[in-house]
Amino acid sequence: MPRVKGGTVTRQRRKKVIKLAKGYYGSKNTLFKVANQQVMKSLMYAFRDRRQKKRDFRKLWITRINAAARMNGLSYSRLMHGLKNAGIEVNRKMLADLAVHDEKAFAELATVAKNNIN
């Protein structure tokens, strides 16, 4: 039985991996075996960090809301408690945006929260 070298299918598969490894340092963008390992690891990082990104942004929003709340004489938890008691359902992303770009509106929300803390 003659030896089969793989031909076009193998070449296409390897070219696909090398294309994904474009921009990698050293031999990781030219040698198939090393590039394949790095591409697999990169895809794992991408999968993990798509989930991590959501946690990171939530932490950032909470930090920004806390800083703005303290400028208005409240802690983050008391602000959120007051807003919940007042029936104001604004998500953290929008609150953080208000804290950064519209301080007057955030101050109004803070006063409403202060008035609704038990």
From Swiss-Prot:
Please provide, alphabetically and separated by semicolons, the GO molecular function terms listed in this UniProt record: rRNA binding; structural constituent of ribosome
Q: Which Gene Ontology cellular-component terms appear in the entry?
A: ribonucleoprotein complex; ribosome
Record InterPro entries: Ribosomal_bL20 (IPR005813), RIBOSOMAL_L20_CS (IPR049946), Ribosomal_protein_bL20_C (IPR035566)
Question: Which key words tag this protein in UniProt?
Answer: Ribonucleoprotein, Ribosomal protein, RNA-binding, rRNA-binding
Superkingdom classification of source: Bacteria
Single GO BP term: translation
Q: Which Pfam families match?
A: Ribosomal_L20
The family assignment reads:
Belongs to the bacterial ribosomal protein bL20 family.
Q: Outline what the protein does.
A: Binds directly to 23S ribosomal RNA and is necessary for the in vitro assembly process of the 50S ribosomal subunit. It is not involved in the protein synthesizing functions of that subunit.
Q: What is this protein called?
A: Large ribosomal subunit protein bL20
Species source reads: Bacillus anthracis
What is the name of the gene encoding this protein? rplT
